[in-house]
């Protein structure tokens, strides 16, 4: 995980998730690493980058998603432990 922050925005519905992803990558220097469909219409979008950029990106993503849908959760892990990669969806851990 290279000590990069991990940011997540969880939405109800794919449209809000796509809107969040678009806003996140446009608003800050972050890398969109994927998404996970949780079930019951919940979709989590995940980004990586330095802490400040990830915080700015998740704030922008959540605001954009609220314009078209519902935001369930927003969270930033500043320096996730390397073992956290074990629970990330396939294709997201690097």
Swiss-Prot record:
Artificial BMCs can be made in E.coli by expressing pduA-pduB/B'-pduT-pduU-pduN-pduJ-pduK (in this order). Enzymes can be targeted to the BMC, and appear to be encapsulated within it. Residues 5-89 form the BMC domain. Its main location: other. It is found in: Bacterial microcompartment. One of its GO terms (biological process) is propanediol catabolic process. Changing residue 40 to T: No change in shell permeability, wild-type growth on 1,2-PD. Pathway: Polyol metabolism; 1,2-propanediol degradation. Gene3D superfamilies: 3.30.70.1710. Changing residue 40 to Q: Crystallized, central pore is occluded, less permeable to substrate, 75% DDH activity, cells grow slowly on 1,2-PD. Bacterial microcompartments (BMC) 100-200 nm in cross section are formed during aerobic growth on minimal 1,2-PD-B12 or anaerobic growth on 1,2-PD-tetrathionate medium, but not during aerobic growth on glucose, anerobic growth on glucose or pyruvate-tetrathionate. BMCs can constitute up to 10% of total cell protein. One of the major shell proteins of the bacterial microcompartment (BMC) dedicated to 1,2-propanediol (1,2-PD) degradation. At least one of PduA or PduJ is required for BMC assembly; it must be encoded as the first gene in the pdu operon. Not required for structural integrity of BMCs, it is required to mitigate propionaldehyde toxicity. Controls diffusion of 1,2-PD into and propionaldehyde out of the BMC shell; residue 40 is particularly important for pore permeability. Homohexamer with a central pore of about 5.6 Angstroms in diameter. The hexamers pack against each other in arrays. Interacts with the N-terminus of PduP which targets PduP to the BMC. Modeling suggests PduC, PduD, PduE, PduL and PduP interact with a cleft formed by the C-terminal segments of 2 adjacent PduA subunits (on the BMC luminal side) in the hexamer. This is Bacterial microcompartment shell protein PduA. It comes from Salmonella typhimurium (strain LT2 / SGSC1412 / ATCC 700720).
């Amino acid at each position: 995980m290279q000590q990069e922050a991990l940011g997540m925005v969880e939405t109800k519905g794919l449209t809000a998730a796509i809107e969040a992803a678009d806003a996140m990558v446009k608003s800050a220097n972050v890398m969109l690493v994927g998404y996970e469909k949780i079930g019951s219409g919940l979709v989590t979008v995940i980004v990586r980058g330095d802490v400040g950029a990830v915080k700015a990106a998740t704030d922008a993503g959540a605001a954009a998603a609220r314009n078209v849908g519902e935001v369930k959760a927003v969270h930033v892990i500043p320096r996730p432990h390397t073992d956290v990669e074990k629970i990330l969806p396939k294709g997201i851990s690097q």
